């Protein structure tokens, strides 16, 4: 993945995550901050979706799809294109999930896809990945992904 595409995907994932969990730490949520963050996530999502770059490897493509799913999920802006874009992203995900090895990235992508379609086989596959990990030695990222899946 080109560094700029990778950076775009990671920046969108980070911004979407922050928007989704805004106020969960007990801090107050201010409408101007919520509006600004929502607009930024939507702008980043639209820019990445509109980009012709999709990544060259399965992992790169999965990272872009994950970022897009997170962005559309976090933002409540919709100019009528959201459902069509989500369906196109999900269609790309179905092919990627078949070839992506069991990993943190695959768990995160399965979780994001499941959040859109609630298809139980996706959850079953995510549970298999989680059960293959040694729960005593999970990284912070793995722990966070497991929590996101369980929520």
Predicted regions and their residues:
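Helix-turn-helix repeat elements of alpha-solenoid scaffolds
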Residues: 30-46, 79-91, 119-125
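Amphipathic alpha-helices that form helix-helix packing interfaces
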Residues: 9-12, 16, 41-44, 126
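Low-complexity, intrinsically disordered regions enriched in charged/polar residues
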Residues: 3-6, 42, 120, 124, ...
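Terminal, low-structured helical/coil segments at or just beyond the last alpha-helical repeat
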Residues: 125-151
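A generic tandem-repeat structural signature
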Residues: 81-120
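Flexible helix-coil transition and linker loops at the boundaries of alpha-helical arrays
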Residues: 46-61, 93-106, 132-136, 140
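Amphipathic alpha-helical repeat scaffolds of TPR domains
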Residues: 2-30, 54-77, 101-116, 144-148
